[in-house]
Amino acid sequence: VQTALTRDQFRSGVFARDGHKCVVCGSAAAPLDAHHIIERRLWPDGGYHLDNGATLCEQHHLEAEATTLHCDRIRQLCGIKAILLPPHMEPGQPVDKWGNPILPSGMRLRGELFDDPSAQRIMAPVLALFTDRVKYPRTFHLPWSPGRTKDDCVMHDLSAFQGQEIVVTAKMDGENTTLYPDYMHARSIDYEAHESRSWIRALHARVGPDIPTGWRLCGENCFAKHSIKYEHLADYFQVFSIWNGSNRCLSWADTCEWTELLGLRTVPVLYRGPWNEAAVRACQRDQLGGDACEGYVVRLAAEFHYRAFRQVVAKFVRPGHVQTDKHWMHGPVERNGLAPRPTDPGTG
């Protein structure tokens, strides 16, 4: 892990490594720019890392900002072997300068800075490459979460919760699934048919036409057993967030209202009220409704933008929780059980 430099150290280090000339055309004529390969606003420390910098002339700096000059090409020209990414981004996922994920087809997903006005202006030449699909963000662990691995990220700064109303919901052991009006996918944007997804596909056929254009529903598909065998689920699909056409997560109150309108259910609520660390910690439990409990998720009750996700959503995972995605995808599907259904479904 590289230590962040000061701005001056970054500039002088990048220029010295690159011989004080543009790594693309070899021009030494001023002005030269110490270009951030990945936008510095995406980094918690400002992104002033030597392996996140490149010396570019004015023309190639503009091309890099517009992303017509690709990050991988810049790294190659600089002799950078390791791909350095902000900690909240998934290793191995190619992204452009602005953090937008790049698919194998060359199409791009909308990242957290996609709708930033400055990014929109400079990316004008490539906007036709973007789909309306959005990958669900990586959720950081709370500092006291014991179920994290060495590759997981931890939210050390909890200041965004201070003085705010929060909602703590049960973390369900299923498959993170996103529903659009005309499409659905799990964490991977490419939909892959699987026996465990037949039920959610039928549900999507019913509710998809009622999802507003540009919106998406995110929830847990608990149809198939993963690590926990459920016997008392309120429903197989449980909503935990709804996003509007401006890539804003609806407030929890609006999420519950929309969930009820669509005839769905939210994940169970464990606590709702002002931020109180003791109250949040008290949400840890071994059982919930007769089933084992994987952990819990904390979020602001108010609406927030996609780019704020890593500051306002965090999780606690029980100790020793085993992820079995590869196993359950390749083995026989074991269907979870439902609790007796009330006549009029509520949304928790």
Predicted regions located by residue number:
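Core nucleotide-handling region used for phosphoryl-transfer chemistry
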Residues: 130-348
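Short, charged surface segments at domain edges that flank catalytic/cofactor-binding sites
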Residues: 1-21, 42-51
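Residues at alpha-helix termini
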Residues: 16-17, 59, 261
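Short coil/loop residues immediately preceding or within conserved phosphate-binding loops
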Residues: 9, 29, 163
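Histidine-centered nuclease catalytic patch
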Residues: 23-55, 64-75
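A detector for short metal-coordination/catalytic motifs
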Residues: 49-52, 58-130
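Short glycine/proline-enriched coil/turn segments at helix->beta-strand junctions
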Residues: 19, 28-31, 181-183, 213
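Short, conserved, surface-exposed binding loops centered on an aromatic residue
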Residues: 13-16, 23-26, 47, 228-232, ...
